[in-house]
Amino acid sequence: YLARDREGMSPRTFHCTWSSPALGEVGGRTLIFFGGPDGWVYAFEALKKAPPEGTVETLKLAWKFDCDPAGPKQDIHSYLRNRKESPSNIKSMPVLHEGRLYVTAGGDVWWGKRQSWLKCIDPTGSGDVTTTHEVWSYPMPSHCCTTPAIVDGLAFVADCAGTVHCVDIKTGKACWTHQVRGE
């Protein structure tokens, strides 16, 4: 191990960890952004250098953001196969773009509710920024596993019902949606 966290994600993990971490610089700090298995986005301060061999460092939490504050946080496994109410998780990689962080989160594809969001977060805070740093939230009626793709002021994500969403990154409003054909 090069590093570890002390945020206690394991007991709040509804299914498993899906998200790849992302690295970016915000306000002169190099941060590691991680979409947690518990529906929280975590920003950790990156290590400045590798620790001495045999040493395991603890990453320092810069901030965290709950993508589903209304979702259950206790006894989460009792919601297994509950398609209406369940904890959320994050399957996508957070994307830092022009001073904002974008991530999709929502119910687990196999075991959870059929609801998700594309979130835009101001990544400059500290501590729990859930109530203070959400720029906007775009709801989707189905699960979402895709990492946002951002170009020319637009975010593109596809949900698990086969709908591609194009969202204006300034307003969080849909520009268009398109139902793709598939099996």
What residue spans do the PLM features occupy?
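Noncatalytic, solvent-exposed loop/strand surfaces
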Residues: 1-183
